[in-house]
């Protein structure tokens, strides 16, 4: 599947429940960061990121396919540790991309004493739950993604050409070059204050 089809599919998947949301609190957030915005404008350790997040407490959105998968995982994990939870109060889906570069970007060879090139394209599903006692809660997050796709090389070098920065020459040596699936799950407990 091409990268454009993947992005289109994920966008439709994330945005389709929004058309059905009624009487709910919903938020769309777009975040971007780039070393270009930093005072020193250095590519050391990080170069750029972009994410779009949609969160809502609507029942339609809570029932979207990605949230359904992660809610099943939440029930399995949280019941396994004895957490008594209600249905989720809210859910969020985030689609993002991040790129990391070493300090010395002009070198074509690998420098084992510097951070490697790497990129991550991901989809994350998170939920907020209250416990049955209503005095505490849980926040969970399931992230699936792909490391090492060729998504930053041309973009970074195009921006660098416009702003007069050095060309990044080591993207062919990035971590998991060509693509490797990745997965992350987290569950955080919260005790509410009176």
PLM segments and residue spans:
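Bacterial N-terminal signal peptides that target proteins for export
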Residues: 1-7
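Cleavable N-terminal signal peptides
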Residues: 8-9, 19
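Outer-membrane beta-barrel biogenesis signature
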Residues: 21-25, 39, 64-86
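Outer-membrane pore/translocation modules
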Residues: 75-194
């Amino acid at each position: 599947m091409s990268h454009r089809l993947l992005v289109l599919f994920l966008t439709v998947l994330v945005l389709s429940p929004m058309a059905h949301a009624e009487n709910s609190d919903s938020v769309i957030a777009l975040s971007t960061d780039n070393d270009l915005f930093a005072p020193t404008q250095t590519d050391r350790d990080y170069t750029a990121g972009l994410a779009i997040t949609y969160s809502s407490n609507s029942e339609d959105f809570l029932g979207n396919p990605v949230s359904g998968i992660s809610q099943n995982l939440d029930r399995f994990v949280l019941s396994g540790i004895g957490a008594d939870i209600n249905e989720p109060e809210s859910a969020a889906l985030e689609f993002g991309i991040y790129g990391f570069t070493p300090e010395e970007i002009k070198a074509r060879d690998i420098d084992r004493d510097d951070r490697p090139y790497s990129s991550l394209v991901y989809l994350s599903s998170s939920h907020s739950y209250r416990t049955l006692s209503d005095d505490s809660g849980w926040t969970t997050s399931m992230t699936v993604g792909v490391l090492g796709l060729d998504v930053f090389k041309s973009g970074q070098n195009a921006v660098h050409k416009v702003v007069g920065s050095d060309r990044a020459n080591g993207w062919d040596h990035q971590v998991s070059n060509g693509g490797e699936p990745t997965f992350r799950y987290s569950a955080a407990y919260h005790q509410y204050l009176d």
